[in-house]
């Protein structure tokens, strides 16, 4: 009798369960809310479009409502609270525990991937139809289209081959896979890109340093060359000055007066005889 009373008390407890579902608009949320309010034991249903959450309050069985929401929405539903471990404790039968264990293992196994497809999108109506029909699938979470590039990006747990078949069946369009990557692969690619960027930056910095060193060496060489030129110029100028001084001194000696005050005869400078000069070969000739 004591065990039966405990079971009744557990069944009479008011629970607030939170489920995560992709809610496209208020109409989608209302389509789930109306049948939930008719469900046995449900007292209140609230939904949050921004967080994509549905809150169900009442004397309810969490697993059954989980199944019903998946059935009505035709989408993947995640149980946020109470956690699957708590649900196992509250349930009395072994069947409910096995269902929860299966669902937790399925959630762990499911890998979220983003596939980019090339599809012909004719107009805005085609775009809306594509998104509407693809979001009906349970394994598709987010759909984005680009009319200019004629591409379709799908995020979810669906495999690429199944996605192609689903598009051909429901939308009647031929699609080609451009890329299909999981979240782990994306993270690895981002890390590789960051490493490459860092390496490129280091290489550029090293090249800049080398160029600066070369420029400094060239400038030093130029400065040394200019100093040498200045030294040579100084030597040349000193030589010319000495020659001029000597010439002036000779002139002064010739122009001095005697003791009596008589000025001697001024000797005129005469060109040297060019009879045997190499500069004028025609000087010596027979007339």
Curated annotation (Swiss-Prot):
Coiled coil: 179-235
Protein's job: Heavy-metal-binding protein.
Organism, as annotated: Arabidopsis thaliana
InterPro entries, per database record: HIPP4/7/8/17/18/19, HMA_dom, HMA_dom_sf
Residue ranges of the region described as Disordered: 181-232
Name the UniProt record assigns to this protein: Heavy metal-associated isoprenylated plant protein 4
Family listed: Belongs to the HIPP family.
Pfam families registered for this protein in UniProt: HMA
Molecular function terms, GO-annotated: metal ion binding
Positions of post-translational Cysteine methyl ester modification: 284
Chain residues carrying a lipid of type S-farnesyl cysteine: 284
Residues in HMA domain copies: 14-80, 112-176
Residues annotated for a metal cation 2 binding in this entry: 123, 126
Record-listed a metal cation 1 binding positions: 25, 28
CDD domains: HMA (cd00371)
Keywords: Coiled coil, Lipoprotein, Metal-binding, Methylation, Prenylation, Repeat, Zinc
Domain of life: Eukaryota
């Amino acid at each position: 009798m004591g065990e039966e009373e405990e079971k009744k008390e557990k069944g009479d407890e008011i629970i607030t369960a939170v489920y995560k579902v992709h809610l496209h608009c208020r109409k989608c949320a209302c389509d789930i809310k109306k049948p939930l309010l008719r469900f046995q034991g449900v007292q209140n249903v609230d939904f949050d479009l921004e967080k994509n959450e549905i809150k169900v309050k009442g004397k309810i069985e969490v697993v059954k409502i989980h199944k019903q929401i998946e059935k009505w929405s035709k989408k993947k539903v995640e149980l946020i609270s109470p956690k699957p471990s708590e649900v196992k404790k509250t349930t009395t039968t072994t069947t409910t525990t096995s269902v929860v264990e299966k669902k937790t293992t399925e959630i762990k196994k499911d890998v979220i991937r983003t596939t980019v497809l090339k599809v012909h999108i004719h107009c805005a109506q085609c775009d809306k139809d594509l998104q509407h029909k693809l979001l009906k699938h349970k394994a598709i979470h987010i759909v984005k289209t680009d009319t200019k590039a004629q591409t379709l990006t799908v995020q979810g747990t669906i495999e690429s081959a199944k996605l192609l078949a689903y598009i051909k069946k429901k939308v009647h369009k031929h699609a080609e896979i451009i890329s299909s990557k999981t979240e782990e692969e994306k993270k690895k690619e981002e890390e590789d890109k960051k490493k490459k960027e860092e390496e490129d930056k280091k290489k550029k910095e090293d090249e800049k340093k080398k160029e600066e060193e070369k420029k400094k060496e060239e400038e030093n060489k130029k400065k040394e060359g200019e100093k040498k030129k200045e030294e040579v110029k100084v030597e040349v100028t000193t030589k010319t000055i000495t020659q001029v001084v000597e010439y002036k001194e000779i002139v002064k000696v010739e122009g001095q007066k005697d003791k009596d005050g008589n000025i001697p005869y001024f000797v005129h400078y005469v060109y040297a005889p060019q009879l045997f000069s190499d500069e004028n070969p025609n000087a010596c000739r027979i007339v």
